[in-house]
UniProtKB/Swiss-Prot annotation:
InterPro entries documented for this protein: K(+)/H(+)_antiporter_KhtT, RCK_C, RCK_C_sf, Trk_Ktr_HKT_K-transport
Membrane topology, from the record: Peripheral membrane protein
Name of the molecule in the record: Ammonium/H(+) antiporter subunit AmhM
UniProt xrefs under PANTHER family: POTASSIUM CHANNEL PROTEIN 2-RELATED, POTASSIUM CHANNEL PROTEIN 2-RELATED-RELATED
Organism lineage string: Bacteria, Bacillati, Bacillota, Bacilli, Bacillales
Subunit-level organization: Interacts with AmhT.
GO biological process: potassium ion transport
Keyword Cell membrane: yes
Function comment: Modulates the activity of the ammonium/proton antiporter AmhT.
Gene that produces this protein: amhM
Gene3D superfamilies: Regulator of K+ conductance, C-terminal domain (3.30.70.1450)
């Protein structure tokens, strides 16, 4: 499956999935939490075959099913614990811009710079998602980091990665 991702200014993010059979699903994630899914029979089609709008909660439920999770009423304690964790832990996609101070730095170098309470779990580079990136991987303009951590640590890390054009 080929996956591409990009920003939609003022809207949110767009992620396109092209299957091995050549069909395509486009997911638009709005800043409001709303998700829109557009299904194309062929990746080259301009006309949508089918579309679907989901709330953030509906998306979570669908995602759990796609991951093969089976929810039983007896699992409510686990679900409550997961909800508590989700309030404390954030998954963030951080775009590396041309003025970012972490361009040309390896994952190992960034690991030493990042605040405590955050993990870099993936890098989206050249239209490929690299899960658990190698320490020697060097970041370039246009790469996107996937980071997981506590909200305050994520915010500090975003500030570290942000462009500092005025310096």
């Amino acid at each position: 499956m080929k996956i591409t991702s990009g920003d939609l200014p003022g809207v949110g993010k767009k992620i396109s999935f092209i299957t091995s059979e050549g069909s395509m699903v486009v997911l638009v994630i709005h800043h409001t939490g709303k998700r829109e899914m557009y299904f194309f029979d062929d990746a080259d089609d301009d006309e949508v075959s089918f579309s679907l709008t989901l709330s953030a909660e509906e998306t979570k439920q669908m995602g759990a099913q796609l991951l093969g999770a089976i929810l039983n009423p007896a699992d409510t304690d686990k679900i409550d614990r997961i909800k508590l964790i989700r309030k404390q832990v954030v998954v963030e996609w951080i775009d590396i811009t041309k003025h970012s101070p972490i361009i040309s730095k390896s994952i190992a170098q960034i690991e030493k710079m990042k605040p405590k309470g955050i993990s870099i779990v993936g890098v989206f580079k050249n239209d490929e998602m690299m899960v658990d990136p190698e320490p020697t991987l060097v970041l370039e303009k246009g790469d996107t980091l996937m980071a997981v951590g506590k909200r305050d640590a994520i915010q500090k890390f975003e500030e570290l990665c942000a462009c500092k054009e005025n310096n």
